Amino acid sequence: MLRRLDKIRFRGHKRDDFLDLAESPNASDTECSDEIPLKVPRTSPRDSEELRDPAGPGTLIMATGVQDFNRTEFDRLNEIKGHLEIALLEKHFLQEELRKLREETNAEMLRQELDRERQRRMELEQKVQEVLKARTEEQMAQQPPKGQAQASNGAERRSQGLSSRLQKWFYERFGEYVEDFRFQPEENTVETEEPLSARRLTENMRRLKRGAKPVTNFVKNLSALSDWYSVYTSAIAFTVYMNAVWHGWAIPLFLFLAILRLSLNYLIARGWRIQWSIVPEVSEPVEPPKEDLTVSEKFQLVLDVAQKAQNLFGKMADILEKIKNLFMWVQPEITQKLYVALWAAFLASCFFPYRLVGLAVGLYAGIKFFLIDFIFKRCPRLRAKYDTPYIIWRSLPTDPQLKERSSAAVSRRLQTTSSRSYVPSAPAGLGKEEDAGRFHSTKKGNFHEIFNLTENERPLAVCENGWRCCLINRDRKMPTDYIRNGVLYVTENYLCFESSKSGSSKRNKVIKLVDITDIQKYKVLSVLPGSGMGIAVSTPSTQKPLVFGAMVHRDEAFETILSQYIKITSAAASGGDS
């Protein structure tokens, strides 16, 4: 480039004699050689005089040439920069495509599979070589002398031909089955776990619901038959079943029903519209999946699905734990009934013919399913007294119930020992309820003294230790009076709140259950998910409802307060009517 400028400077050609750089081919610096074709005009004496003049037009021509050259070089640099950016973008896109292609084809697993196949092939080749080597050694060891070999050559050829044909025929017939019985090492394949996704979790729950729908429909139809939802259908089913059992056709009847169900499913799969159900099916609205969800909607969706999964797993765990506790003699009086029934069935199967045993079992099952269960479902009190399977199932405990019973027994023992050690001088004429009410105490003292109540007022058994909460009195403006932390108790006639900060009883709150005008569940902070952890109680003396918030066992407390409130109000109403 400098040499080109030197040529321009020392030759001193005019502007028209230069090669226009803007019209030159777009090439790089390496492609441009020093020999640029220039027009060599004839110089006249006048031109030579102009060239000798340092301040003449030659200087202007050189300046304009340098500017044009710089401009073209700047354009070339911009063009090269653009090509470089395009190349980088193409490289980035190609890398993304390569990554997606690797994820789709799962090249790593294919490579591992290829390595395993190579190792297996090498092992097989080694085994084949060992077998061939052993055969050659055996042939060398069993090779007879030359005289005997010539004598028995024809017989051996015939025997070898016959044995080879026999081996070939045997391999063609049974070789595949022999290969199937060959032992191979078990391959431990590790399944890749999918990451947690709200959309995936919701879709799995919907799939589970759709998959369990045939089973739930079958159970609903059986329940409808037992409940005589359709009188004609239940009567026909009862008559057909009892006749089949009486004539010994119960098992063929069930097999025929299974074949009929599969035939109907085949026709439905072929496009036939066949809908038969005792209970009319209720079509649930299908919610279209939302593509764009906000963070709060995703969080609420995950909470809803987690709640459904929690309830489903809880029911399944209850069933499995009850079955386990039935067979593990957790409650001996219940398992003893099952034990005696199994012994009776065993002895009956040993001494009576199977036809008679099957007839008795089938008749009992039909009468129990169609008649006895119908009466028991219509009369719950009769069922609670005489339905043995129902009583056994309801009385079977789950593992959490066993833990609660054990903890309650331990606390009861501690209470009895403490009452014996600390209250030896209780009056003998008092009953158990009066004694418990008189000496029931909180952390700050006796219960009736703290709330200025009568001695027979004591907390109910459900809330003997109270529920921790915070009282929000929205009628007050001071922060100390607006929110108070403490414990909530429920007695037979009062709702008592004990403040945990002050020792004076002025900060405690006592509300008569009769004075309550409204009670409902309350959500203190609407931005948080869920149904809240508060209870709102309205009374005539307060302008705004009193809110007991931050209760962990909110539902239990609400049910207790509501049931006691209904009990007190109904008793007061009946007393007023009389």
Swiss-Prot record:
It is a multi-pass membrane protein. It comes from the Eukaryota. Residues 83-143 form a coiled coil. It is found in: Mitochondrion membrane; Endoplasmic reticulum membrane. Keywords: Apoptosis, Coiled coil, Endoplasmic reticulum, Membrane, Mitochondrion, Phosphoprotein, Transmembrane, Transmembrane helix. SMART domains: GRAM. Residues 44-53 have a biased composition (Basic and acidic residues). This is GRAM domain-containing protein 4. It comes from Homo sapiens (Human).
